[in-house]
Swiss-Prot record:
It is found in: Plastid, Chloroplast. One of its GO terms (cellular component) is chloroplast. GO terms for biological process: mRNA processing; RNA splicing; tRNA processing. It comes from Andromeda polifolia. This is Maturase K. Keywords: Chloroplast, mRNA processing, Plastid, RNA-binding, tRNA processing.
Length: 506
């Protein structure tokens, strides 16, 4: 077991830049889509270039470490006034700022590595890592060949100290690892950092940067090993988890030492090349072309994998296995299932002609417009039937503020429909969102909607409300080893926390 764990040890060299985009995938996608690379998501009021950031990071780390060891550690208290390690007294807000500052320090090096890699590189769509905009190609192209899907909630560490252990093991500086442990043990809210909430995780509003970093690192550790084991799915017939790992190590030795040329091709026949993995908001989905028996083995394996390797207890009933041909898959607010569509193929042999009926699969991706209308009706954009209404609460706002709110609401919906070819639901939602703004502005100026549109200009209003989003694709460096390139196949990283959510999650 120890040798197998050593074999699965991840490459944590600073030269492998591909590790860091995986750790901060949520930040990177939000940065690319919502902010742009010229504006940092970590610093709202400041911009850091490559020349000054390194000096800033070194100063912050030196200052934090020096204060921690020079004045008998930081002192955090829940009362209003607490001893300040910088001298005098400080409020709880100052302590939170120090804690948040440490999270920023941890994030800066990863952000700089991404910028240094993107400089001078052509921005193309990556085939290893996919953004949220590729969810429809994933459903329409990849899941169409799948037969069964398993949906489960991603297991989180029971205590934040367990998540910090993985990050501390990968930290290069021992002082940084000691500072991470110190913050976890000294901060008063450490017992309520991550709280489960409807298959997602709500982080502390005061310190979400640092703990989101720990959570991402924990999930990345799990996914990195999972990608490797996914390629060994042919050995899932083993009953015991320990036996499963031992057989992986055994076959790897044979593949590398004895049958380096032939055994690999033999193993590939028994593997499932159509196993897809998707994670979003603390929930992940496994889609496979295999039978339900294979998915049951994956269910048994995942529970034991979390328990034995990560010391996390997961209940099997939280894993749901569905047949795509019989059940619909609810993911990202969409309903998708594979339906059998009969097709007629006419063939002719010599003089006799006959008909052959072949059953083909067709993936139907539907947007539940009913639930979206229900959410908009609760927000007073329309009634339960979808008829737009004016917003009296916006009457005191300026015209530009009203238009900006409508534009923001449209952008939330457009972000999730931007990659879909079936945009009928999107057009309906845009219609519902536009008219309340027009009605509110017309009522504010005491004129009709038609007169208001004529005064403003339909073209200007249409251009303002329907401005298309710019889809930005990132390209990430690949690993140097051929094996890791193989392990990254068909893994879709879609777990995004900072991009605006759909209206029903507000």
């Amino acid at each position: 077991m120890x040798e197998c764990k050593g074999y699965l040890e991840l490459x944590r060299s600073x030269x492998h830049d591909f590790i860091y985009p995986l750790i901060f995938q949520e930040y990177i996608y939000a940065l690319a889509h919502d902010r742009g690379l010229n504006r940092s998501i970590f610093f709202e009021n400041a911009x850091y270039d490559n020349k000054s950031s390194l000096l800033i990071v070194k100063r912050l780390i030196t200052h934090l470490i020096x204060q921690m060891y020079x004045q008998n550690h930081f002192l955090f208290y829940t009362n209003n006034f607490x001893p300040d390690p910088f001298g005098g007294y400080x409020t709880g807000v100052x302590s939170x700022m120090i804690f948040e500052g440490f999270g920023v320090v941890v994030e800066i090096p990863f952000y700089l590595r991404l910028l240094s890699f993107l400089e001078g590189k052509e921005r193309v769509k990556s085939h290893n890592l996919r953004s949220l905009h590729s969810i429809f190609p994933f459903l329409e192209x990849x899941x169409x060949x799948x037969x069964x899907x398993x949906x489960x909630x991603x297991x989180x560490x029971x205590x934040x100290x367990x998540x910090x252990x993985x990050x501390x093991x990968x930290x290069x500086x021992x002082x940084x690892x000691x500072x991470i442990r110190f913050f976890l043990h000294e901060y008063p809210n450490r017992n309520s950092l991550i709280t489960p909430k409807k298959y997602s995780f709500s982080f502390s509003k005061r310190n979400k940067k640092f703990f989101l970093f720990l959570y991402n690192f924990h999930v990345y550790e799990y996914e990195s090993i999972f990608v490797f084991l996914r390629n060994q799915s042919s050995h899932l017939c083993s009953i015991s988890f320990e036996t499963f790992l031992e057989r992986i190590l055994f076959y790897k030795k044979i593949e590398l030492e004895v049958f380096a040329k032939h055994f690999k091709a033999i193993l590939w026949v028994f593997k499932d090349p159509f196993l897809h993995y998707v994670r979003y908001r603390g929930k992940f989905i496994l889609a496979s072309k295999g039978s339900s028996l294979l998915m049951n083995k994956w269910e048994y394996y995942l529970v034991n994998f979390w328990k034995c390797y990560f010391y996390i207890w997961a209940q099997p009933r939280r894993i749901h296995i569905k047949q795509l041909s019989k059940n619909s898959l609810d993911f990202l607010g969409y309903l998708s299932n594979v339906r059998l569509k009969p097709s007629m193929v006419r063939s002719q042999m010599i003089e006799n002609s006959f008909l052959i009926e072949n059953a083909g699969k067709k993936l139907d991706t539907l947007v539940p417009i009913t639930s979206m209308i229900g959410s908009l009706s609760k927000a007073k954009f329309c009634n339960v039937l979808g008829h737009p209404m004016n917003k009296p609460v916006w009457g005191g706002l300026s015209d530009s503020x009203i238009m900006e709110r409508i534009r923001a609401x449209i952008x939330k919906s457009s972000h999730y429909y931007s990659x879909s070819l079936k945009k009928i639901s999107l057009y309906x939602i845009k219609y519902i969102l536009r008219l309340p703004g027009a009605k509110t502005l017309a009522r504010k100026h005491k004129i009709t909607v038609r007169s208001f549109l004529k005064r403003l200009g339909v073209g200007l209003l249409e251009e303002f409300f329907t401005e298309e989003e710019q889809v930005f694709y990132l390209t990430f460096p690949k690993a140097s080893s051929t094996s890791r390139k193989l392990y990254q196949r068909r893994v879709w990283y879609l777990d995004i926390f900072y991009i605006n959510d759909t209206p029903n999650h507000e």
